[in-house]
Amino acid sequence: MSSKRAKAKTTKKRPQRATSNVFAMFDQSQIQEFKEAFNMIDQNRDGFIDKEDLHDMLASLGKNPTDEYLEGMMSEAPGPINFTMFLTMFGEKLNGTDPEDVIRNAFACFDEEASGFIHEDHLRELLTTMGDRFTDEEVDEMYREAPIDKKGNFNYVEFTRILKHGAKDKDD
């Protein structure tokens, strides 16, 4: 009996506590949102995000990512990407980053050419069909003062600057 207790005590010392620190970085609602995002990306529902999951997710958004692009994304992780690793990676990215960078990088996820622009129709589709969905009225409100050129390209770099620092006066 005492040998079983000794084994139990040794077993208790083995679990790594690093994962619990990751979960402590976020409140429950944030963790739930990350879980929803993870599940949206984990297309084959195997509990891991792999290159095929990323490809399928981007293809569902109308993108045709190259293997090189996908490999670059996968190389961000030191190993298989389960939910804990996903949360850890976001924790590292969000820890100490400027909110302006976070907002700009969120838009950049959908800018495959890294041009700083997303076509307004495509952005509307994304905002009204993914995550915390916007209504068409909310998108219209956002577009009222948004930097959109004559070709319908939404300048998310400038928009992020406006969100953070305010709009420039039109009289200047």
Curated annotation (Swiss-Prot):
Disulfide bonds: none annotated. The keyword 4Fe-4S does not apply. Residues 1-20 are annotated as: Disordered. The modification Phosphoserine is found at S20. It holds the Pfam family EF-hand_7. InterPro entries: EF-hand-dom_pair, EF_Hand_1_Ca_BS, EF_hand_dom, Myosin_RLC. Ca(2+) binds at D42, N44, D46, D53. GO terms for biological process: myofibril assembly; platelet aggregation; regulation of muscle contraction; stress fiber assembly. One of its GO terms (cellular component) is muscle myosin complex. This chain binds calcium. This is Myosin regulatory light polypeptide 9.
